[in-house]
């Protein structure tokens, strides 16, 4: 089972309920700005195209998107951000990656270290856990939305690597270069994904029990609440019952 996709689904639902629109917009604007540094034409820049699509899905105003692109290309003055990935461990030896976009490295290092230390985790050295993850496209679909055989044929024909049974959902995994094609095929088939993103997918998982589950959730939420944090990935394997209890 892929606990990371269950956590992503729970986060998506909790985010919608909590209506943390300002936080979501801040993260999306940073992603658009960084992506636009590689070129302001979304047709020629897959990362920018994906970032703009994510912003539109959250109903971000077009003017906000335009200004974020212009800051990235240097057309208008903006904050000088850098992207950093921190590595660390949670309870039970769970591996964690934290991707940040920051204008103050020292401040962010201190905040991330504090979040780890206060919530049952610890920072690791560069390279300590990154090798446990691979960059993949992940598209999560409710089982009620599609039959396995039909979905399998659809996604494999459009470049996906695998279709996994993930409890109440199907999870499609693909190479980042195939992500847009697979996602477009899914949408054209009339299927709306629960979650769709390119991220760091763990190659192996660690199962937690008892109090470790609550500690791990608290740590993940503390890291994700960081002002500079864009994404948090881990190789914890939550089961559905554990997450439903946490989401309560």
From Swiss-Prot:
Lineage top rank: taxon: Bacteria
Cell compartment(s), UniProt: Cytoplasm
This protein's UniProt keywords: Cytoplasm, DNA-binding, Transcription, Transcription regulation
Any one annotated GO CC term: cytosol
InterPro entries in the record: Integrase-like_N (IPR017856), TACO1_YebC-like_2nd/3rd_dom (IPR048300), TACO1_YebC_N (IPR049083), Transcrip_reg_TACO1-like (IPR002876), Transcrip_reg_TACO1-like_dom3 (IPR026564), YebC-like (IPR029072)
Main subcellular location: cytoplasm
One BP annotation, GO: regulation of DNA-templated transcription
Presence of the UniProt keyword Transmembrane in the record: no
This protein's name: Probable transcriptional regulatory protein Acid345_2125
Matches recorded under HAMAP family: Transcrip_reg_TACO1
Family as reported in the entry's similarity comment: Belongs to the TACO1 family.
GO molecular function: DNA binding
């Amino acid at each position: 089972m892929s606990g990371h996709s269950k956590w992503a689904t729970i986060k998506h639902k909790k985010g919608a309920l909590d209506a943390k629109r300002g936080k979501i917009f801040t993260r999306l604007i940073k992603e658009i700005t960084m992506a636009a540094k590689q070129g302001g034409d979304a047709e020629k820049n897959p990362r920018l195209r994906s970032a703009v699509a994510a912003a539109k899905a959250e109903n971000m105003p077009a003017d906000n998107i335009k200004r974020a692109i212009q800051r990235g290309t240097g057309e208008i003055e903006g904050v000088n951000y850098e992207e950093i990935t921190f590595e660390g461990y949670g309870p039970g030896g769970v591996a964690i990656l934290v991707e940040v976009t920051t204008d103050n490295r020292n401040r962010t290092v201190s905040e991330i270290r504090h979040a780890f230390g206060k919530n049952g985790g610890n920072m690791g050295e560069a390279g300590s856990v990154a090798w446990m993850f691979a960059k993949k496209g992940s598209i999560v679909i409710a089982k009620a939305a599609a039959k396995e055989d039909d979905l399998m044929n659809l996604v494999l024909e459009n470049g996906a690597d695998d279709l996994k049974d993930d409890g109440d959902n199907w999870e499609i995994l693909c190479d980042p270069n195939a992500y847009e094609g697979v996602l477009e095929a899914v949408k054209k088939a009339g299927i709306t994904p629960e979650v769709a993103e390119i991220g760091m997918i763990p190659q192996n998982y660690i199962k937690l029990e008892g109090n470790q589950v609550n500690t791990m959730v608290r740590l993940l939420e503390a890291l994700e609440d960081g002002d500079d944090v864009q994404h948090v990935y881990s190789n914890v394997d939550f089961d559905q019952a554990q997450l439903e209890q946490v989401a309560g």
